[in-house]
Amino acid sequence: MLRPKRSGESYQIEIGKTFGLYKSVWTDKRYDSNEYGTKLVNSLIEGSGFTFPKSLWAVYDPVEAVTGKDKDAIILDFFAGSATTAHAVMQLNADDGGNRQFIMVQVPAPIDENLSPYKRGFTTIAEISKERIRRAGEKILEGECHAGWKRDVGFRVLKVDTSNMKDVFYRPNGLGQQDLLDTVENTKADRTPEDLLFQVLLDWGVDLTLPISRGIVQGKTVFFVDGDALVACFVSIR
């Protein structure tokens, strides 16, 4: 049994009743990247194209050891790939009733048109990452879960993009007569109300994972973030 013990900004790993370092070489069958990596991913997404992704348990066990009793921990994987980390976090939550969250980062690296994933409709690695999370979540919900678990396998996809605003306030020396109307309506024409909402959330430092709903008030679409913690409407009044 591995249990973490915080020591300042680091952790000691408790093994049974003694302390020791985590093994640097894992030979248990559960860490086999073919059986619990390649085959597992292909069982969720046939022809995923990933060769020897990490074993689910090779991520699950360190996450369990490091987060320990902190069941609200946030786990960041800056190279999501086949999204093994997301799968492991959801599985661990299902096993111990935790509410850990994951942040997966993946560039939309294109997939070769001649490869199986492309022929199955996946054009980027990021698309496979997202689909693995969806299907892994569904599979976990079908299995045996901790009675106290919230059964939350949802996730939100955010993409890095340019600003929603026209570049009008950043060139004071270049402001001309033709730019004056842009100081009144400075939102780019192709941006949606959802785009504007998330820019507000970012600017105000609001948690991007909070629940968002929409309603109609006097014929206008209104967004409600976390109930009524933030209410926003992005309708131009002319």
State the predicted function of each range.
Residues 1-74, 96, 107-112:
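Class I S-adenosyl-L-methionine
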Residues 43-51, 66, 75-78, 116-125, ...:
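Short, contiguous acidic/charged loop-to-helix segments that flank catalytic cores in large enzymes
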Residues 56-139:
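Conserved S-adenosyl-L-methionine
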Residues 198, 203-206, 231, 237-238:
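Flexible, glycine-rich loop/tail regions that form catalytic "lids" or insertion modules at the edges
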Residues 203-222:
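Conserved helicase/translocase motor-coupling segment
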